[in-house]
Amino acid sequence: MATINQLVRKPRVKQVVKSSVPALNACPQKRGVCTRVYTTTPKKPNSALRKVCRVRLTNGFEVTSYIGGEGHNLQEHSVVLIRGGRVKDLPGVRYHTVRGALDCSGVKDRKQSRSKYGVKKPKA
């Protein structure tokens, strides 16, 4: 335990918390343009073709973003909205594209968890 005199001479240093989503600049979402849309394979125990896109954001950052849901309509030059949230089995993918916003359509025929995939309530 430091004495009061020691603390007067050299105060305690606050620990700096490093952001897990630096490209967002403390914003909830950011807009960007797809520069490349492709599939990639996950880490060891899993096997799939995960849909991802490279996005150039409005603040100049270029990030890799995951496209959730079954099927998508994204191609090069599509304008997308990016939110934080990493994909555990894809190294370097720290962002998600927001479905149903800007050029990214919602998931077709989605009935459950619709709000996460940009789907309106179906007519009864």
Curated annotation (Swiss-Prot):
Record's signal peptide: none
Classification via Pfam families: Ribosom_S12_S23
InterPro entries given in the database record: NA-bd_OB-fold, Ribosomal_uS12, Ribosomal_uS12_bac
MF GO annotations: rRNA binding; structural constituent of ribosome; tRNA binding
Coiled-coil ranges per UniProt: none
GO cellular component annotations of the record: small ribosomal subunit
Record key words, sorted: Methylation, Ribonucleoprotein, Ribosomal protein, RNA-binding, rRNA-binding, tRNA-binding
Function, in words: With S4 and S5 plays an important role in translational accuracy. Interacts with and stabilizes bases of the 16S rRNA that are involved in tRNA selection in the A site and with the mRNA backbone. Located at the interface of the 30S and 50S subunits, it traverses the body of the 30S subunit contacting proteins on the other side and probably holding the rRNA structure together. The combined cluster of proteins S8, S12 and S17 appears to hold together the shoulder and platform of the 30S subunit.
PANTHER family: 30S RIBOSOMAL PROTEIN S12 FAMILY MEMBER (PTHR11652)
Family as reported in the entry's similarity comment: Belongs to the universal ribosomal protein uS12 family.
Subunit details: Part of the 30S ribosomal subunit. Contacts proteins S8 and S17. May interact with IF1 in the 30S initiation complex.
Official protein name in the record: Small ribosomal subunit protein uS12
Gene it is expressed from: rpsL
